[in-house]
C-alpha cells in the first residue's frame, strides 16, 4: 500500500518507516529537516516540507492509501504543531478521497482518559499542569480528527520506551491500564501498521500496553 507518514523523523516515526518498508509498503516520509532522517530505500520517498503549509501537506496525500500521524509535542513549546498539521491533513484527505487516518494520541486526552484509575487521572492532571500547551495541542488535534468523516483510528499508548518490538501487548478500548503501564515505540508502530486495513478500531481510541 501507499503510506504517507508525518513525523517520520521522530522516535516513533522512524519505527513506522522501517517497519512499513519491511512489510513491502511504499512509504512517503514527510520531514522538515532531511539531515535528521537517515533511512534510504527503493520504496521510500522523502519529501521535505512544512506541516504549516497546506500545499506541502496536500502534495504528499494525493494518490496515497493511508496517512499515519506520528507528530510529537515538545515540552513547554506552544507551537500547536499537531493541531496545525491535522487542520491541513484532514481536508487534504477529504479532497483526494484518502479514507484511513491513523494517529498517535495519548492516555491523558480524549475518551482514553476515562479508562484511567483515579490515581491515573491525578497523575495526568499533574502532567497537564506541567505542560498545558502539549495537552491542549493533542486535545485540539483529536477534536479535528473526531469531527471528520474519515476512517480514523486514534491510538492511545501510555508511557513510551525505546525497547524492542515484541508484537506482544494488550490492546482494546475498554482496558484500564495501571499508572505504570508502558509500551515501546517500536510496538506502537507495529500496532499502527496492523490498523491500515483492519476495520476493528475505526472511529475508536484503542489503548495498548504490556
Where are these predicted regions, by residue range?
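N-terminal Rossmann-fold cofactor-binding loop
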Residues: 30-35, 50-51
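NAD(P)-cofactor binding segment of oxidoreductase domains
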Residues: 74-101, 140
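Conserved Rossmann-fold cofactor-binding substructure of NAD(P)-dependent oxidoreductases
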Residues: 45-65
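N-terminal Rossmann NAD(P)H-binding glycine-rich loop of SDR-like oxidoreductase domains
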Residues: 3-23
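Conserved catalytic-site region of short-chain dehydrogenase/reductase
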Residues: 107-113, 160-163
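Conserved beta-loop-beta element that borders a ligand/cofactor-binding pocket
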Residues: 142-163
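Substrate-positioning beta->alpha
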Residues: 81-86, 137, 155, 183-193, ...
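Glycine/proline-rich active-site loop of Rossmann-fold NAD(P)-dependent oxidoreductases
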Residues: 111, 164-169, 195-204
